[in-house]
Curated annotation (Swiss-Prot):
Domain RNase H type-2, chain residue ranges per copy: 29-220
Name of the molecule in the record: Ribonuclease HII
EC number of this enzyme: 3.1.26.4
Function statement: Endonuclease that specifically degrades the RNA of RNA-DNA hybrids.
Taxonomic source organism: Rhodococcus jostii (strain RHA1)
Reaction(s) catalysed by this chain's protein: Endonucleolytic cleavage to 5'-phosphomonoester
Gene giving rise to this polypeptide: rnhB
Cofactor(s) needed for function: Mn(2+); Mg(2+)
Enzyme class: hydrolase
Localization, UniProt: Cytoplasm
Transmembrane region(s): none
Residues at which a divalent metal cation binds: 35-36, 129
Assigned protein family: Belongs to the RNase HII family.
GO biological process: DNA replication, removal of RNA primer; mismatch repair
Length: 226
């Protein structure tokens, strides 16, 4: 009888495919990896991706790693390779307004559910990056630092990151002045300076403390001026 989660010896030094291979050998494949991009940003969408890779080596994906460790150019080069070679992949997005309404953690969990549900292949097991996701259609295991430990999570992290970055570059055209194409909505000094100067745009998350504080100051200033 298989225990849940199964007891597997994982040697991270053996490479990114070790975890999936162990699960597949235990009869638990196909294995899906899930990851997000934009959780900590104060502007733009939260994007979640799921990906299933076949349990075999892919020379075209040799550079696969945690998307945050890769250059933008490498991520862009890996993106079409992942979408071409993956058994299945799925990307879902929650706009800023929906993140505010749901809360970022709830949106993240729901995004992971939707991304897995959107796969064209039903996974036998799901690896998530960092925390438990209830309500998935298959047994799952949270993996701390999963995007650097499992290839399917690393692939999902690239899909989510590239998809979101492209949205932020386009957003820079519709909302100029904030530098979205550069900082991608994260709280960099340049972004915070632009936010103070221009005020929030519709793509800023009102539930974020720095955005909410700015709105509060503006409202108070407007009230005292009347």
């Amino acid at each position: 009888m298989t225990s849940w989660p199964p007891r597997i010896v994982i040697r991270r030094s053996s490479g990114l495919r070790t975890m999936e291979s162990a699960l597949v050998r235990s009869g638990l494949g196909p294995v899906a990896g899930v990851d997000e991009a934009g959780r900590g940003a104060c502007a733009g969408p939260l994007v979640v991706a799921a990906c299933v890779l076949a349990p075999k080596p892919y020379p075209a994906l040799a550079r696969l790693d945690d998307s945050k460790k890769l250059t933008e150019r490498t991520r862009e080069e890996l993106f079409p390779a992942i979408t071409r070679l993956a058994v299945a992949w799925s990307v879902v997005s929650f706009p800023a307004e929906e993140v505010d309404r749901m809360g970022v953690h709830v949106a993240n969990i729901e995004g992971m559910r939707r991304a897995v549900a959107g796969l064209s292949t039903t996974p036998g097991y799901v690896l998530t990056d960092g925390f438990r996701v209830p309500g998935l259609p298959a047994p799952s295991l949270p993996v701390i630092g999963g995007d650097a430990a499992a290839a399917c999570i690393a692939a999902a992290s690239v899909l989510a990151k590239v998809s979101r970055d492209r949205v932020m570059v386009a957003m820079d055209e519709t909302h100029p002045g904030y530098g979205f194409a550069i900082h991608k909505g994260y709280n960099t000094p340049a972004h915070l300076t632009a936010l103070e100067k221009l005020g929030p745009c519709p793509e800023h998350r009102r539930s974020w403390s720095n955005v909410a504080a700015l709105i509060h100051r503006v409202d108070n200033s407007s009230g005292s001026a009347r």
